[in-house]
Amino acid sequence: LVEDKLVPLIRSILKERQAGQRRMPVFARDGSAFQKIMHRIRLVAATDMSVMIFGENGTGKEHIAHHLHDKSKRAVKPFVAVDCGSLTKELAPSAFFGHVKGAFTGADCAKKGYFHEAEGGMLFLDEVGNLALETQQMLLRAIQERRYRPVGDKADRSFNVRIIAATNEDLEAAVSEKRFRQDLLYRLHDFGITVPPLRDC
């Protein structure tokens, strides 16, 4: 029964969070479906390919992203997670690229963005399908050119970041509905990992 699996699963996740551990949930270490996921992680972890993780809410997509990071050559560098659902199109440029002092009203000091914080490591875009189209265009340009410009600055900055994204929706359908850019999906989806729902575990 699903209920029989959920209680020990929740207890395990809470215990691991309290211990400050970044491990895969216990349920992810058993069963053929997750052995296949682990195999795909091993295939791609040591590369710099972008990875798209597909799965419903609560299936451990961020755990998989952490595991990819821990098994990669970037493991000693930062892992920066971004909740894409909380970023408005107005806040996104400063959040991703940072800003200089005086760039806008209230910018009393310079701020580093996610790309700077993740330099040399991994940037995890959680629920990337929630990004506004304007933000998608901004990210696409940065990824294509491997450069960005902090808000209010006069010079571009290069970056060395591996991008992992996750989504709980069908992004191909979102492309058809013109809610997600096809070219950005292409850039983010060099390699895909699909996480089965808990009911199938």
Predicted segments with their positions:
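Conserved two-component signaling phosphotransfer/partner-docking surface
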Residues: L1-V7, P93, Q137, R181, ...
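Coiled-coil segment of the histidine kinase dimerization/signal-transmission module
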Residues: E16-A19, A142, Y148, R187-F191
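Short, solvent-exposed amphipathic alpha-helical segments in soluble enzyme
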Residues: H69, R179-R181
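AAA+ ATPase active-site-proximal loops
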Residues: Q21-S158, I163-E169, A174, P197-D200
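N-terminal accessory segments that target, anchor, or regulate ATP-driven/P-loop NTPase machines
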Residues: L1-R22
